[in-house]
């Protein structure tokens, strides 16, 4: 079977907080694959998925459900049961990478820089009372802090706390998305994202993308609203810094056991250090997303999508 005759089923949408982004990602990938001569179809992640797989009989499945069950290994576990090759990490590795505290602990143990953090479950607040918990942890905290859900993406539920008053409201917001939250030391610097793809010869780091916003806060609106952010591709880095951050991204991709593609996010501080923030097993593919921008800087997003599908199809 030639590469161009491959049938690709793209799973997007679902009942997650990132549904809209997922649907837009799915449509863009489908268009890119069609441009390359593939038969591509987008289906919603709902109760009709099993029949869609049976009817379309894809050679490859590309899951693009962002957040929660789309990236925590749940969807990947279902796809394992189909016996059809799918794009992305295995269930165990997706689960590992999607849990930010666990991923940070593993990366930190390998000697790579990552900001200090603590992770807290909502159950702790219910049992001890929010005021008591915050009183116990505040003495050991240094503000400002970044408060975020322990899993999920698109910066949903993420905010910066400059003092104890901010911390309380920030945690309420984060807990509205996830039952576990992470308090992370704020590192001033530039947002740098490095996308990684697996090829025959091993992982390849695409050109780093730098994101600049007016208020320095790369939140949901800044990520998915045109003109809210300024992008530099490649990032404004020296040759040595470029090599360092790409090498770190590949190291993290391999350390977490990620497969096919990933996006590794860093903060570059004023001293030239790169601080690992998180790893994305199903990066956004919208017009303002970082993976497509890196792919276009390499050559062609359409061609990158095609190469990923062809690589995955070999696992059949």
Task: For the regions a language model picked out, list residue spans one by one.
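Phosphate-binding site of ATP-dependent enzymes
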Residues: 162-247, 273-275
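Conserved hydrophobic "DFG−1" position in protein kinase catalytic cores
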Residues: 10, 196, 266-268
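ATP-binding N-terminal substructure of ATP-dependent carboxylate-amine bond-forming enzymes
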Residues: 1-102, 121-133, 311-316
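ATP-dependent carboxylate activation and anion-phosphoryl transfer catalytic cores
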Residues: 3-6, 111, 238-316
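Active-site nucleotide/adenylate-binding loops and adjacent lid/helix of ATP-dependent enzymes
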Residues: 1-12, 96-189
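Residue-level detector of anion-binding/catalytic polar loops
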Residues: 39, 85, 113, 180, ...
């Amino acid at each position: 079977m030639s590469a161009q005759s491959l049938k690709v089923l793209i799973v997007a949408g679902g009942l997650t907080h990132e549904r809209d982004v997922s649907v837009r990602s799915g449509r863009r990938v489908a268009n890119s694959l069609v441009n390359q001569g593939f038969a591509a179809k987008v289906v919603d992640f709902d109760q009709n998925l099993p029949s869609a797989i049976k009817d379309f009989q894809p050679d490859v499945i590309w899951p693009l459900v962002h957040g929660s069950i789309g990236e925590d290994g749940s969807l990947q576990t279902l796809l394992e049961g189909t016996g059809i090759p799918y794009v992305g990490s295995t269930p165990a590795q997706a689960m590992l990478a999607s849990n930010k505290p666990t991923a940070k602990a593993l990366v930190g143990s390998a000697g790579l820089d990552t900001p200090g953090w603590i992770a807290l479950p909502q159950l702790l607040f219910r049992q001890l009372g929010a005021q008591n918990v915050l009183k116990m942890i505040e003495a050991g905290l240094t503000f400002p802090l970044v408060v975020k859900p322990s899993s999920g993406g698109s910066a949903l539920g993420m905010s910066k706390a400059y003092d104890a008053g901010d911390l309380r409201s920030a945690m309420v917001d984060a807990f509205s998305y996830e039952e576990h939250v992470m308090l992370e030391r704020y590192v001033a610097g530039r947002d740098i994202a490095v996308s990684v793809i697996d090829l025959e010869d091993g992982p390849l780091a695409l050109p780093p993308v730098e994101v600049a916003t007016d208020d320095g806060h790369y939140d949901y609106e800044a990520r998915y609203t045109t003109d809210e952010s300024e992008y530099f591709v490649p990032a404004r880095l020296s040759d040595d810094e470029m090599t360092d951050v790409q090498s770190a991204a590949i190291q993290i991709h391999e350390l977490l056991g990620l497969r096919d593609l990933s996006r590794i996010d860093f903060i570059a501080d004023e001293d030239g250090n790169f601080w690992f923030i998180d790893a994305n097993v199903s990066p956004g593919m919208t017009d303002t997303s970082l993976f497509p921008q890196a792919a276009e800087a390499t050559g062609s997003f359409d061609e990158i999508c095609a190469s990923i599908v062809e690589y995955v199809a070999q696992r059949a």
